[in-house]
Amino acid sequence: MAAISQPVIVIGAGLAGTEAAWQIAEAGVPVILYEMRPQRQSPAHHSESFAELVCSNSFGAMASDRAAGLLHEELRRLGSLVFSKASEHQVPAGGALAVDRALFSEDLTRTVADHPLVEIRREELRSLPTEGIVVLCTGPLTSPDLAEDLQRFTGQDYCSFFDAASPIVTGESIDQAIAFRASRYDKGEAAYLNCPLNRDQYLAFREALVTAEQAELKDFEQESAKFFEGCLPIEELARRGEDTMRYGPLKPVGLFDARLGDWRDPENRSRRPYAIVQLRQEDRAGNLWNLVGFQTNLRWGEQKRIFQMIPGLSQAEFVRFGVMHRNTFVNAPQLLDASLQFRQRPTLLAAGQLIGTEGYSAAVAGGWLAGTNAARLALGRSPLVLPDTLVSGSLFRFISSAEPKYFQPMPPNFGILPNLEQPPRNKKDRYAAYRDRALQDLRDWQQTHAIGNLSPSTGLATTAIA
């Protein structure tokens, strides 16, 4: 085993950086974790805690026959710190994994800071360290000086898109004589509050969104803004067509107020909602609720006026209004290998949204792999590549091999997995087959490299460097 001459440097304590720093330290390698907050705040963050969830508080579906849920299970078996803490701070969200974002981030901050091999430096790095092993996890809001230095290093302009966050309201301000608790098709707990709209209410709400005054974008004109399709502002959906929202975040199917009786009763057919606004619990106490799918760039006064048009929210008290910010990412297919190393400098690794993976879970997965490989490099070992039959492995294969000219951020999904040899015709069976293949291949890979948990969902494991 090689002698460790200097600590690994991790830049950025978001989801990816927090996971990376932990994996490095757990492998017995000292690490210095740089975080510029609170010395310098980003446009989207509200605290100085590590792994702050700046958009939703949900990591997506938990079921392992869904891409998001399968990625969760992969990360649990790999010994992810972030997913261990997500389970500890889970709040009701039907079939989704949602967390109390404040408790989750504060716990992660304490846990990482208390590790004897982790040194925290609350300062901004304005340029890439030129020596040693470095893991870059600065996210889509990388500070201007560091972004300029990275641009100089890669010789490339950044790609970019606009991202947005949803408003949060207090639970006591929601009229629960109108809003009702339910999960779609009664799956899981009745964890969502649902605000029903009839046709007239929906059309008036859509008209208000289409004609509302938007906040001015700082980076360039609104007309040239590109949005990530998985996180479109609600007003953008409204502009795309009369029914677009009803087939998206305001989809009413599978939801009915049980106080009115059975939705299947003939007399209740006319009482089915034309559209539904869902609110998801933000904290364990149920004091805060997030408007699901209501990312927005409306001015704050307009948000209050228009969102209070929603039945049940006429007296809503907003603790956070929706915000929009520009996300930048590098053209990963031209720069990175599937090990998340830069080809022109293998001791520089990167993870998170900066490399074009989309979503919280993907950032954690990238942090896990980049951190694991940084530790292996420090110990004189060869870096690893995850099997591409895994959701995580397929994602990193995609971002390292896609067509650079058309590269856009990619979320976890089954569409980028290798084809099954004998795919079932039924979609549910096909997704289950993807899951079974992935978990078997992960188990084989773990046994080969002596890494992580070999049994499902057993919490933390010590990273092994074999």
Curated annotation (Swiss-Prot):
SUPFAM superfamilies documented for this protein: FAD/NAD(P)-binding domain
Subcellular location: Cytoplasm
Cofactor(s) essential for the protein: FAD
InterPro entries membership: FAD/NAD-bd_sf (IPR036188), MnmG-rel (IPR002218), MnmG_N (IPR040131), TrmFO (IPR004417)
Predominant localisation class: cytoplasm
Catalytic activity: uridine(54) in tRNA + (6R)-5,10-methylene-5,6,7,8-tetrahydrofolate + NADH + H(+) = 5-methyluridine(54) in tRNA + (6S)-5,6,7,8-tetrahydrofolate + NAD(+); uridine(54) in tRNA + (6R)-5,10-methylene-5,6,7,8-tetrahydrofolate + NADPH + H(+) = 5-methyluridine(54) in tRNA + (6S)-5,6,7,8-tetrahydrofolate + NADP(+)
The protein's enzyme class: transferase
Membrane spanning residue stretches: none
UniProt GO BP: tRNA methylation; tRNA wobble uridine modification
EC number: 2.1.1.74
NCBIfam families: gid_trmFO (TIGR00137), PRK05335.1 (NF003739)
Function comment: Catalyzes the folate-dependent formation of 5-methyl-uridine at position 54 (M-5-U54) in all tRNAs.
Family, as annotated: Belongs to the MnmG family. TrmFO subfamily.
The protein's name: Methylenetetrahydrofolate--tRNA-(uracil-5-)-methyltransferase TrmFO
Organism: Synechococcus elongatus (strain ATCC 33912 / PCC 7942 / FACHB-805) (Anacystis nidulans R2)
